[in-house]
Amino acid sequence: TPLFIDKYNENIKFCSPVSGKIIDIVRGEKRRILDVIVEADSEISYEKMDVPLNEDLSREQIISIMLKSGVWPFIRQRPYDTIANPNDIPKAIFISSFSSAPISIDNDFALYGMDELFQKGLDYIVKLTKGKTHLNVSNNTNPSQIFINAKGVEINKISGPHPSGNVGVQINHIDPLNKDEVVWCINPQDVIVIARLFNDKKYDVSRIV
């Protein structure tokens, strides 16, 4: 269920991660919303999304479904690291499978056993660009097979210390932006969220942190 919408684009919805009721809205300076606090039900229920069974969906159909379901805000746009504009066509899409920052999430562990779901998410994501979808893995470790065996994407091995896992650094080295160009970025666990939407027809944002 949507909690609020983007005032600049009413098609972009921000949905509640749980079923329940809003108990507080925390505002900061100039009434900026800082937190929307939702008290979860004892048993989480999911709204069934209207997702066609046909897997051969067009780019426009995929974007429409993502907007209506509330998963669109997981797609970020560079430059400026804002929510992607669904009316733009990115020159490429970037997914950094690792974080080089200390004490950060291990995506090899977080996505363990989700190979099919991850690939399903990629199958939809690659349709959002006419260019390449770059899946970047660390060359400093042995990346999980979930990333190495991914299909339909360009796999790039990245070496070096922090901030080598930063997607902005990766873009600058692999496919630098020219004037008026944009690229879209997405986190590996959010690829799973998109896959669940099309696979299970529900907005399930559960994840390992």
Q: What spans do the regions from the language model cover?
A:
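Buried, small/hydrophobic-residue-enriched core segments of structured protein domains
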Residues: 9-12, 26-209
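Generic structural signal for buried aliphatic residues
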Residues: 1-3, 209
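Short coil-to-beta-strand transition motifs
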Residues: 11-19
